[in-house]
Design a protein with these regions (language model features):
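Well-formed, non-transmembrane alpha-helical positions, independent of function
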Residues: 24-25, 42-43, 125, 143, ...
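A short, well-ordered alpha-helix in the C-terminal region of glycosyltransferases
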Residues: 221-235
């Protein structure tokens, strides 16, 4: 705000599908607005709205390292990757804990990032399912993405941008504990474009795994999701944003 008052050339970046109050306020005073979703020019009172995507880390999922060996997984089984962020997500973790009997009898396997906050509690359950690999945090996300046939995740802005780039079939469970309900709005936008299934946080405990199992067996839907996510992906967002900024200097 001070920069614009002093007549410096300024820009903002809105990462979510619906802008927060601060960016809506600043949008009236900045030179450029970078966004990651379509139709935000209707919300911002500014003609210079550019949809260049969110800057992400570009993982190389074509690495030669064997990801199944790294995670001690069976390369002949379909894999569900479950992510709840670095701290974890209670509802997503309950969606696994409450369905251990289904996992035990299944032909698929699960790579489960519990988050640091829930890890010790989950280990105390002494889970012994051979087709369930439990991690507090996954450092090698490139390998995790490579083994995944489908991914279950929260719906943060950067997570969605990264998952669009990866373009694996996706189930999003937006957190209800986010200012302006950004995660739900983000997830709805991806769902509207055919890039994911959407499970409400309150339903994850009972419905999440069933949705994942059904998706594993639905080849047509998986192909559609991959194509939709690929169209939404903007892997060169960081470079393109910087280039536009340099043009203004």
């Amino acid at each position: 705000l001070i920069s614009s008052i002093l007549n410096f050339k300024t820009a903002i970046q809105e990462q979510n599908s619906f802008p927060g109050y601060t960016n809506r306020l600043l949008s009236k005073r900045v030179k450029l607005i970078f966004v990651a979703y379509n139709n935000l020019e209707k919300i911002f009172d500014n003609n210079n709205v550019l949809n260049l995507g969110n800057p992400i880390r570009k993982y190389n999922i074509n690495t030669n390292q064997d990801p199944f060996n790294y995670f001690n997984l069976d390369e002949n089984k379909k894999t569900i990757l479950v992510l709840g962020g670095s701290l974890g997500a209670k509802s997503i973790n309950e969606g696994i804990l409450n369905n251990l009997s289904i996992i035990r009898e299944s032909s698929f396997q699960v790579l489960w990032q519990t988050g640091d906050y829930y890890y010790d509690h989950i280990l105390s359950k002494k889970i012994e399912e051979k087709n369930l690999v439990i991690k507090s945090f996954i450092k090698r996300m490139d390998l995790a993405y490579k083994v995944a046939d489908i991914i279950i995740s929260r719906a943060g802005a950067i997570a969605i941008s990264e998952l669009s780039y990866i373009s694996k079939p996706l189930i999003l469970i937006p957190s209800p504990n986010v200012v302006d309900d950004h995660q739900r709005k983000n997830a709805n936008e991806i769902f509207r474009n055919g890039g994911c299934l959407l499970v409400e946080d309150k339903d994850a405990k009972d419905n999440m795994l069933n949705q994942a199992i059904n998706l594993l067996d639905n080849s047509e839907m998986k192909i559609k999701m991959k194509k939709s996510l690929g169209k939404l992906a903007k892997p060169d967002a960081a470079k393109n944003i910087v280039s536009k900024i340099y043009e203004q200097i």
